[in-house]
């Protein structure tokens, strides 16, 4: 599947670069989206299964992904400016296909290993608890996705509008990038921390901090706004690693890919909702209203996380309880 991800994305990008009209371009981009969607449910499950240091591995993987998103626009713009817009598709197409060939060459075929994957999680759950846990994860995925996307999408405009309307574009971009770097550093720090502190405890702390950061940002201005945004972004980035860790612990290897597929489907859906939400709320009350509503969503995330933590404490305590001798 990962080979299909690499080579499929490469061929789709090449087709987009060769597209003679908008219809062909749309078909190529649709194919690119289909192949790109393979990564999160398959790649994340493989990473978790293979690593012995889940926290650090997930954090590093997340930072690399965010770095790729941050660099993509600049690299594409440079290629389009200095070469042509088609080069912005051809260059990553070649890199994808070559990476896919190398991946298939150096990675052993593991079909038989896949059939022997464990069908029960590290911590067994009753069917009722499993359904409740999955329901909480759905609410967490939607609320975290909305909070994340509202902040990251609106961040440059928030800085521009709330600080000053006369700031140079380069300065605004620099401030927004600095705030996002705080998120990346938090992600790495949390990845280290979860190897020493129970992930569910960190999850509750991080989401609580995220709520406070969003609430502060809704009322702050000037330097205080930048600090509040940095706290909110750091928290929402940091919770991603802990969320993945908890899902890995309570999901069997054989089902982990499906669970991650549902989670990232909800996250991608929330991205589209966030764009419409920002537009509607900003038109009604500016970014004060946008950040205020985002704080309410962050509060929902925090409350749901507390419910998840309470369930985990109960399950873990029951598992550690010594069984009576027969």
Spans of features found by a protein language model:
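Structural signature of the two symmetry-related core transmembrane helices
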Residues: 1-14, 201-216
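Helix-breaking motifs and short loop linkers at transmembrane-helix boundaries and internal kinks
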Residues: 18-23, 52, 219-221
């Amino acid at each position: 599947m990962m080979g299909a991800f690499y080579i499929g994305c490469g061929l789709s990008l090449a087709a987009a670069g060769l597209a003679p009209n908008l219809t062909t371009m749309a078909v190529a981009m649709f194919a690119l989206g289909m192949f790109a969607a393979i990564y999160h449910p398959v790649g994340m499950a493989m990473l978790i299964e293979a690593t012995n240091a889940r926290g650090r591995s997930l954090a590093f993987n997340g930072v690399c992904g965010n770095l790729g998103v941050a660099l993509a626009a600049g690299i594409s713009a440079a290629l389009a400016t200095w070469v042509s817009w088609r080069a912005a598709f051809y260059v990553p197409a070649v890199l994808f296909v070559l990476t896919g060939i190398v991946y298939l060459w150096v990675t052993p075929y593991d079909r038989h290993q896949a059939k022997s994957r464990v069908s029960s999680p590290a911590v067994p759950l009753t069917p009722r608890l499993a359904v409740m846990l999955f329901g909480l994860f759905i609410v967490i995925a939607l609320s975290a996705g909305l909070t994340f996307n509202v902040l990251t999408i609106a961040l440059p405009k928030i800085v521009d509008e709330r600080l000053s309307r006369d700031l140079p574009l380069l300065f605004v971009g620099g401030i927004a990038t600095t705030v996002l770097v705080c998120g990346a550093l938090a992600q790495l720090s949390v990845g280290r921390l979860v190897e020493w502190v129970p992930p569910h405890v960190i999850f509750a702390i991080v989401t609580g901090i995220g709520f406070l950061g969003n609430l502060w940002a809704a009322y702050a201005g000037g330097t205080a706004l930048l600090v509040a945004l940095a706290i909110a972004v750091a928290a929402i980035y940091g919770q991603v690693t802990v969320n993945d860790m908890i899902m890995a612990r309570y999901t069997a290897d054989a089902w982990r890919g499906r669970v991650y597929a549902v989670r990232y489907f909800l996250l991608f859906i929330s991205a589209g909702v966030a764009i419409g939400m920002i537009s509607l709320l900003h038109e009604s009350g500016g970014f004060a209203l946008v950040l205020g509503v985002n704080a309410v969503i962050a509060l929902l995330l925090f409350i749901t996380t507390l419910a998840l933590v309470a369930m985990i404490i109960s399950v873990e305590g029951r598992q550690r309880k010594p069984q009576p001798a027969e």
